[in-house]
Regions:
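Short alpha-helix
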Residues: 227-243
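A short, conserved alpha-helix within the catalytic core of class I
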Residues: 175-193
Length: 292
């Protein structure tokens, strides 16, 4: 991904904030779902098969196929990813956005959906090096490395760039206090962190404590902090959303325990990244903010 003048991405250069972020929220400890895998938090090993014509088959935590014409087939949770696809299409078509950061990108399905709907500057970030490698292999097979790129990343450290849209899917229950440590500041600090890298919209998937995955693995309880489970609530999350952003929409992605919050970036309480110097901000391709 280039950061030449005119690109939708610009490098993040605020050294003071970088220093504070590194001290405050670096990955606290390695906590893996399956100890047999040396990286990541998922049990599934990523597998990618690339045909001679460029068609791609990905299996693992995410399961999808990309055909030679660019069409994507969702092999699991098609209803969920179809909803996300519709939201991305609206962000691109109605608002003109073309840059997106996919936080917790895994094998790149969300990024591929964004690319398919018209985003042309997409960066994936994940702490699992095997899935990051899979993402980049898929991008290369689709001849899309100028538009799609992923790199290894620890949540809470500075992102390498900023974008008009930041998407953070299905990792809140991990980063709240387990694979990262935002326990002291809670959802307020998580949103403040993410908002530094989104110039227009922030999309976050809420994972409710009633979710089967959370009830089975007990992510928050595993943090070992007294009373922490009482802080990981939808009421606290929505309070932080209302404090730091304008909520444009929310919709269930996969039952009532997984809900996507679509937020517009504000200038509240000096928390907006627009407080930085104009030269450090990505250009606003279209700043229309009608009803989402």
């Amino acid at each position: 991904m280039s950061s030449v003048p005119g690109d939708s991405f610009e490098p993040y250069r605020n050294k003071t904030r970088i220093s504070k972020l590194r001290r405050a929220h670096v990955q606290r400890k390695d906590t893996y779902k399956d100890p047999s895998r040396p990286v990541g938090t998922q049990s599934e090993v990523p597998i990618v098969n690339i045909a001679s014509d460029g068609a791609v088959r990905v299996r693992g935590y995410q399961n999808y196929d990309i055909y030679t014409d660019g069409q994507i087939t969702f092999r699991t949770k098609a209803h969920k990813f179809s909803k996300i696809e519709a939201i991305f299409a609206k962000l691109h078509t109605h608002h003109g956005f073309t840059s997106l950061i996919d936080v917790g990108c895994n094998a790149g399905l969300i990024s591929m959906i964004a690319w398919r709907t018209g985003f042309r500057h997409v960066m994936g970030l994940d702490h699992d090096s095997e899935y990051v490698e899979t993402f980049n292999r898929v991008a290369a097979a689709r001849n899309a490395t100028d538009s799609l790129h992923a790199q290894v990343f620890s949540f809470g450290t500075p992102m390498p760039t900023r974008a008009e849209v930041v998407f953070c899917g299905a990792i809140l229950h991990w980063v709240f206090c387990l694979t990262a440590d935002f326990s002291s500041g809670g959802f307020d600090s998580i949103l403040r962190y993410l908002l530094q890298f989104a110039s227009e919209y922030l999309l976050v998937e809420w994972i409710d404590p009633s979710d089967d995955a959370m009830m089975g693995f007990q992510h928050i309880k595993k943090c070992g902090i007294d009373g922490i489970e009482n802080r990981y609530t939808v009421a606290n999350f929505e309070r932080a959303v209302a404090t730091h952003t304008t909520l444009m929409s929310k919709q269930s992605l996969d039952g009532p325990s997984r809900v996507l919050y679509v937020m517009r970036v504000d200038c509240r309480a000096g928390l907006s990244p627009t407080a930085e110097s104009p030269s450090s901000r990505p250009p606003a391709l279209n700043r229309r903010h009608g009803p989402f």
